[in-house]
Design a protein with these regions (language model features):
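Short runs within selected transmembrane alpha-helices of multi-pass transporters and secretion channels
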Residues: 63-66, 135-154, 161-169, 194-210, ...
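N-terminal transmembrane alpha-helices
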Residues: 3-31, 35-39, 52-68, 72, ...
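Transmembrane alpha-helix boundary and packing residues in multipass membrane permease domains
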Residues: 15, 19, 31, 71, ...
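Helix-terminus/linker motif at the lipid-water interface of multi-pass membrane proteins
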Residues: 20, 24-46, 115-122, 178-189, ...
Length: 473
């Protein structure tokens, strides 16, 4: 194995390991909520789900703090410019503090709007609101950790990023169990303890990152004096940085539109297809936990080699990262092809749900190649700080997602609804444009899967076409 492949694995494997722990937090929180005494399990689990969705809506909009910091830091690192590396860090921290303050100030208006957009029961809304109003106080830590994550990636330091995630997720799991369920003779705090556990975990992660910077990066960060921060935040220096982050913000909003639109559309299809859509998305996102590790490696190496003006190594790193990413895609195609039904049985013990989901297994075989390509290109373009193609690809992907869904719905569901063959053989018009009985009753979710595939394909094709605009940087 050559040195570049070793470098890719050094950067990717810690990220993959950290990513694998992410779903464990949600599983544990759900399990704790489902076993609380004095609270109906369905209400508590539903409140965790709704509350988590509130924070996804909120924090995903600020993911540009991570993505914008990573590429810039990697380029400064590659150029050997320690002062620029430090300036990017402190500017990111200042912006994170400002964003966190804004989030805390707007927590009540945001919550009111978010609750209005849900169709949950009053009991679920009340618990979800309680969860939100506790967990929101982790905002300063959570938003700062986004900047730390990007900066560590740019510094080619995936180990610190991994340990940060392991600390956050590990503390979250332990704290939520203890605070929610209690320990020994102490009964715990109940539902509020789950939210408080997340708050404690985020601040533990922040403390860990501060210690890492003091021990490992004190000299690097000392290359930039805090007295110079005003100049770094001036209009002349902040302008290009904010334009790039503005593009990345629009990218985040477009992606959020797809990943919020998918479950919202699925809620119109009835309980069985809604359950199938949730299972399919979990399996579709599973391979992204692995691919993202190589996307982060691509981001770090592309930025570093661009900063070092080493175009040959930059192109080689992109080629090798894609080989690793496509290997992940092929592995998951094999897993879904050979073990699709057993994998479904791991997620649900309901035979009816397993049988219904099996109709959508072909999508699990089609998605990995185009999905892995889209995610890997994201890392490459982030490393090159080419925010405009990233913005455009996601905006058009969102348009494609909605366009494909509504066109297919209009052509086959809303108008010209199929007929239903009755027991006597007589043909009756189907009164429902959404839930179609009979052998083609799965069409709505198939159409939604087509729309999701189209969104990934647009991202892949768009960025593939734009590769020539950055390969000679």
């Amino acid at each position: 194995m050559n040195s570049l492949n070793k470098e890719i694995l050094r950067l990717a494997l810690p990220s993959i390991l950290a990513n694998i722990t992410v779903p464990l937090v949600g599983i544990v929180d759900t399990a704790v909520a489902g076993h609380l005494t004095g609270t109906e399990a369905a209400v508590a689990i539903g409140a965790i789900s709704v509350g988590a969705m509130f924070f996804s809506l909120l924090y995903w909009n600020f993911s540009f703090l991570r993505t914008g910091t990573g590429g810039l830091t990697a380029q400064a690192y590659g150029a050997g410019d320690q002062r620029e590396v430090a300036k990017i860090f402190w500017r990111g921290m200042a912006l994170s503090a400002a964003v966190a303050l804004l989030v805390l100030l707007l927590q009540w208006p945001f919550l009111k709007v978010a609750v209005l957009c849900t169709q949950a029961s009053p009991e679920v809304e009340a618990l979800a609101s309680q969860y939100f109003l506790i967990r929101i106080w982790a905002a300063p830590a959570t938003i700062s950790l986004m900047t730390f994550s990007g900066w560590f990636v740019g510094m080619q330091d995936s180990m610190s990023s991994m340990w940060k995630d392991l600390v956050v997720n590990g503390v979250n799991i332990v704290a939520s169990i203890i605070l929610g369920r209690g320990i020994g003779s102490w009964p715990g705090l109940g539902f509020a303890g789950i939210a408080l556990g997340t708050v404690i975990a985020q601040y533990c992660g922040l403390l860990f990152c501060i210690v890492v910077c003091l021990v490992k990066y004190r000299r690097v960060l000392g290359a930039f004096r805090l007295s110079e921060l005003r100049q770094a935040l001036s209009r002349s220096e902040l302008g290009p940085y904010m334009r790039m982050n503005g593009n990345l913000f629009l990218r985040s909003v477009s992606m959020l539109g797809v990943y919020i639109g998918y479950p919202l559309i699925a809620t119109t299809m009835g309980d069985m297809l809604l359950a199938c859509s949730a299972v399919m998305m979990q399996l579709l996102m599973l391979f992204s936990y692995f691919t993202d590790g190589f996307a982060y490696a691509g981001e770090a190496l592309v930025g570093r080699f661009i900063g070092a003006r080493d175009n040959v190594s930059m192109r080689r790193s992109v080629r090798y990262v894609f080989i690793w990413s496509m290997s992940i895609a092929l592995a998951f195609i094999g897993i879904y092809w050979v073990g699709g039904v057993p994998v479904l049985r791991l997620l649900t013990s309901d035979p009816a749900v397993v049988q219904a989901c099996s109709a959508f297994l072909p999508w699990l075989i089609l998605m990995p190649p185009v999905g892995c390509a889209a995610f890997t290109w994201d890392g490459v373009f982030l490393g090159a700080t080419a925010s405009r193609p990233l913005r455009d690809s996601c905006v058009w992907a969102f348009v494609a997602f909605l366009g494909v869904w509504f066109v297919l719905r209009w052509l086959f569901l809303d108008s010209g609804t199929p007929d239903v063959v009755g027991d006597s053989g007589a043909v009756f018009p189907d009164p429902s444009p959404t839930v179609i009985p009979g052998p083609i009753g799965n069409l709505p979710l198939h159409f939604l899967m087509v729309a999701y595939f189209a969104h990934l394909a647009v991202r892949t094709v768009w960025l593939s076409a734009k590769w020539k605009s950055i390969r000679d940087l």
